[in-house]
Amino acid sequence: GLVGSEMCIRDRLGGMAVRDDNNPFGSSDPNFGTAGNARLGIPPLIMGHGITGVRAGRNPDVKATYFATPIAIGSSWDPILYGRVGTALAKELRAFGQNLNLGPTLNVIRHPLGGRNWESFSEDPYLISQLIVPFVKAQQTHGIISGPKHFVVNNQEKHRFDINNIVDERALREIYLPGFKAAVVSGGALNVMCAYNRINGTQACEHKRLLTDILRNEWGFRGFVLSDFARAMHSTAPSALAGMNVEMHATKFYGKNLVNAVTQKLVAENVIDQLLSQKLFAMFKVGVFDDFHNYPKSIVHSKEHQEIALE
């Protein structure tokens, strides 16, 4: 239960030093995720891509079920079907030993030339909000932490690393945030990926108003925030103080730099405890610690899943 999970988290936090060799705040190859800690009984967090199907590493010989693209799912207007897709994807992710899905993409389609428009559902925030809830619930019911992305106002590929998106409060609330709010408030999403871009001059992954004031304090988000890969992080202390939990993929600003920030009293140890406990809570909540929801490899590309894909 929830109380038991929180007690287990406190036990593990009590035994973990800030300078622990197993960095829980950054990537750990070859797991494509974060390292575990055998001494404290913390398993690794292994991530996977499951947008249209499971990408199990870079091996083209690995077969998985290919489902419709999100933009096609959006055209179906069928949340129940997408919930079934979420269940099938979760089972295949677990069959490959993964426990976090880096997706789905909840950015609204804003430009016809957007290189990843296929990965989004629609230009309609309401439709996105309706589709995402059953998908998140299905994923997390079957042992996969769902990670909606890219938070937020990440709507083009060109200049995505350095663009500064100027957006007023009404547009933010009515267009860009509703899908994420639905995923968290109604779906119970336990992970959110922060984006490469800036919003009104502040980097998304060090945006305290978005990551703490809105995501956690307004919406009640209890999971952890993951940075987009390689170039979304730009700082150590500001990111930690904003509520950014895990840096991906290379550990450039966290790791030893985070240890140094604590030593220099730029970041308090209780902030570190909070960042770690939020990640552990998500892992407990979906059963990663208990290794629940194991599925055989035979479920991958099964007849049942192929039939769902054909619908």
Where are these regions (language model features)?
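Glycoside hydrolase catalytic-domain context in secreted enzymes
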Residues: 1-311
